[in-house]
């Protein structure tokens, strides 16, 4: 049985090094999809690079934890910027959901302005769309706009009927122990669960000053090395997987 594999590189637009890494992993590796941060410091650079890579499917990486929002978000920003304090607000059930709804719509429109088309799908920076308070907002928006959504089905079960997503999602290809065997173990685990479609999240990048400031730095370069391995591409095909994007879901 043929299975669909979407290898999605997060953080398109974060930095030039991140952008170049994603393009390299698409051209010479197994990355088929990416998600862009429309408020990223290198988003214009990402748009420019994407014009020469029509095979790369591009979705939107909804941002609520970094940089400046596109709308006024007094309930979520501090000194005008977003940050990881969103976790504390979520724990206190004090998230400004109306502000988040408006920001989602604004980032979506900004994506269309930048890339000239709808995103293939939605996900989010630091997985904030999986917060139980935020997920219904994002799921409803994706369903209404007719675009797919990254959804970890181990965390949510109540999905809109017309929402497109994969049967499986994995964030396990991450950390200090990145290897081909780890990637293939993710696929094997998915196969054992009987999933016919799977998204694997990744973050391939070349190191630059912005990436050096990230808590997740050098493994991004290791990811790039693994994702451009010819032997990995062969092993994926051997397991009955077809590389694709959320347009195939």
Swiss-Prot record:
It comes from Escherichia coli O17:K52:H18 (strain UMN026 / ExPEC). Pathway: Glycan degradation; chitin degradation. The lineage of its organism: Bacteria, Pseudomonadati, Pseudomonadota, Gammaproteobacteria, Enterobacterales. Its main location: cytoplasm. It is an enzyme of class 3 (hydrolase). InterPro entries: COD_ChbG_bac, Glyco_hydro/deAcase_b/a-brl, YdjC-like. GO terms for cellular component: cytoplasm. The gene is chbG. One of its GO terms (biological process) is polysaccharide catabolic process. Its EC number is 3.5.1.105. Gene3D superfamilies: Glycoside hydrolase/deacetylase. This is Chitooligosaccharide deacetylase. GO terms for molecular function: chitin disaccharide deacetylase activity; deacetylase activity; metal ion binding. Involved in the degradation of chitin. ChbG is essential for growth on the acetylated chitooligosaccharides chitobiose and chitotriose but is dispensable for growth on cellobiose and chitosan dimer, the deacetylated form of chitobiose. Deacetylation of chitobiose-6-P and chitotriose-6-P is necessary for both the activation of the chb promoter by the regulatory protein ChbR and the hydrolysis of phosphorylated beta-glucosides by the phospho-beta-glucosidase ChbF. It catalyses: N,N'-diacetylchitobiose + H2O = N-acetyl-beta-D-glucosaminyl-(1->4)-D-glucosamine + acetate; diacetylchitobiose-6'-phosphate + H2O = N'-monoacetylchitobiose-6'-phosphate + acetate. Homodimer. Belongs to the YdjC deacetylase family. ChbG subfamily. It is found in: Cytoplasm.
């Amino acid at each position: 049985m043929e299975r669909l594999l979407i290898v999605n590189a997060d953080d398109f637009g974060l930095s030039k090094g991140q952008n170049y890494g994603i393009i390299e992993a698409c051209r010479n590796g197994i990355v088929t999809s990416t998600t862009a941060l429309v408020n990223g410091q290198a988003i214009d650079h990402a748009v420019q690079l994407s014009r020469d890579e029509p095979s790369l499917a591009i979705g939107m990486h909804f941002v609520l934890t970094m940089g400046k929002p596109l709308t006024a978000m007094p309930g979520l920003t501090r000194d005008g910027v977003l940050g990881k304090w969103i976790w504390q607000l979520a724990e206190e059930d004090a998230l400004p959901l109306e502000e988040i709804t408006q920001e989602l719509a604004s980032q979506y429109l900004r994506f269309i302005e930048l890339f000239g088309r709808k995103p293939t799908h939605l996900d989010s920076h630091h997985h904030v769309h999986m917060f139980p308070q935020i997920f219904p907002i994002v799921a409803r928006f994706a369903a209404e706009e007719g675009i797919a959504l990254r959804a970890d089905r181990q965390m949510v079960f109540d999905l809109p009927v017309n929402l497109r997503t994969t049967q499986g999602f994995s964030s396990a290809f991450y950390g200090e122990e990145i290897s081909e065997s780890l990637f293939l173990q993710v696929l094997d685990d998915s196969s054992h669960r009987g999933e016919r479609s799977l998204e694997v999240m990744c973050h391939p990048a070349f190191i630059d000053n912005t990436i050096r400031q990230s808590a997740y730095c050098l493994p991004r370069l290791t990811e790039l090395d693994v994702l451009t391995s010819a032997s990995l591409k062969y092993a994926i095909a051997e397991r009955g997987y077809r590389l694709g994007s959320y347009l195939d879901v």
